[in-house]
């Protein structure tokens, strides 16, 4: 394959979920410096739930988004700084502030059937001259054909790249292939596509490779898989795999290996891996960032986190419904009492 893959690192955004948004300024600078030296194309920086995600519902961050972005801007020389915005959490004013702090790429994220709420934010990002990306979360919850319709909306608002986002880590290679084929058949050939995987079924790397085989241009990954649930496609693993395939990625594998093991892994207070709870996320098709919230609720109410996660999947809960985790826990407790 001749084309150069665009490597988009998400350690400093999705990775926030893995440590409940508690990166220090020193942490983000150490990680960003290592990524920059390894020559990734972009480094996404924000609270795990995007600009202004720091809240009672999602969890408060150790710092503000702008403090993290400015800290990364101070040390990065090669990579573009990206950020994430969920309409309804972040506003265009927050986006302007992030731009002023150094962000030049924005991924505007909606649930996979709600692209229409991204119009204002995508149009505003384009007016700022930002690299503007549409990000369709929980892409497993709609059909490939319907996903393509939503992607087309984002394209019409001005997105120059649209992502298939497997937020639940619930898709297999056939699911990914079908969605990229649908997007490629619907979008303008000039519009890029991207893949954001989660590793809950251990398919993060495989799914990303299949996406590229179907014409995907940009791939999200994180050092040591640092991300919600069982994490994202581990960056160093993905790079090693595609290098063996002879694909052009432009990054330094050995620097990534060192950064993953020496800088990122020691920060994990809960191992980012496939285990009983994170496997349940992928099996039940649940939003990966529900993991830590569900574990807290399970401890509080004397339940199993797996039971909470499976019930959330049955109820088809989506990102933004974190408050329902406690409701589900209380319902399970009631059911237990009546059993």
UniProtKB/Swiss-Prot annotation:
PANTHER family: 2-ISOPROPYLMALATE SYNTHASE 1, CHLOROPLASTIC-RELATED (PTHR10277:SF9), HOMOCITRATE SYNTHASE-RELATED (PTHR10277). Substrate binds at residues 13-14, 167, 196, 287. Mn(2+) binds at residues 14, 196, 198. One of its GO terms (molecular function) is 2-isopropylmalate synthase activity. The keyword Iron does not apply. Keywords: Aromatic hydrocarbons catabolism, Lyase, Manganese, Metal-binding. Signal peptide: none annotated. It holds the Pfam family HMGL-like. This is 4-hydroxy-2-oxovalerate aldolase 2. GO terms for biological process: catabolic process; L-leucine biosynthetic process. HAMAP family: HOA (MF_01656). Belongs to the 4-hydroxy-2-oxovalerate aldolase family. The record marks 13 as: Transition state stabilizer. It catalyses: (S)-4-hydroxy-2-oxopentanoate = acetaldehyde + pyruvate. Its EC number is 4.1.3.39. The active site is at residue 17. The keyword Cell cycle does not apply. It comes from the Bacteria. It is an enzyme of class 4 (lyase).
